[in-house]
Amino acid sequence: MEIIRKQVLHLSAIPRDLDSVITIDSAKEVDPQSVGMLHADVDKIWDNVIKVYKTGVHPAITVSLRRQGKVIMSRAIGHARGNGPADHANTPKELATPETPMCLFSTSKAVTAVLMHMLAEDGLINVMDPVSFYAPEFARKGKGNITIHQILAHRGGIPGLPKNVSLDTLWDEDATWELLCNVEPIMTDVSKLAYHAITGGFVLERVIRKVTGENINA
């Protein structure tokens, strides 16, 4: 049955003893009543997380929930490795914890957009300005007029990196930025939408860094 779940349905195996794969950082979690919530509210949220985990779609789920700046939930369920559909039976199982790094990618787009609008509210940027106004090197290869707004709206004309770029390069922000500065836009018609799945975040991060001197990952 486990073989069918993994190889046919591409699902993770769910242990009978769920407590054995749950990690709760009790030292970080505050009493929910201190921020106007009930214990029942937290229990309901966590019960729904468990329901999602029990589908087997995700080998691990981590939850970090804050209210009024205080941590209400800092929890994890499942395995960081060893129980995924592609893992071999002899792969050592490693429990996920609240500290386990998770690759967010598009989930972080909302955070980046909020930061850009906060900078705009503070008068540090204008989203209608060209990216090159803040990062002149971005103007290479005909990108001098591409605006921050166009990048936010996935209309910047640079939806992807060159095909021969190694995924490992994405861990090097400076190297990726240099690639983006040297890439030619595939279109200049801002009415055309092309999802900037990866590229937009690197461009906006660089604007944030140029304006504030801070790294978005700091």
Regions found by a protein language model. Name each.
Residues E2-V42:
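Short, compositionally biased leader-like segments
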Residues I24-D31, D87-P98, N182-M187:
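Short glycine/proline-rich turn/loop motifs
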Residues V35-M102, N126:
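Short, conserved catalytic-motif segment at the N-terminal edge
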Residues S74-I77, P162-S166:
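Short, solvent-exposed loop/turn and secondary-structure capping segments
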Residues P85-N90, S166-D189, E214-A218:
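Short, charged, amphipathic alpha-helices and their helix-cap/turn boundaries
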Residues P92-E94, P98, S106-T107, V111, ...:
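Active-site helix/loop module of the DD-peptidase/beta-lactamase fold
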Residues V114:
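Cytochrome P450 catalytic-core helices
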Residues V190-T199:
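Cytochrome P450
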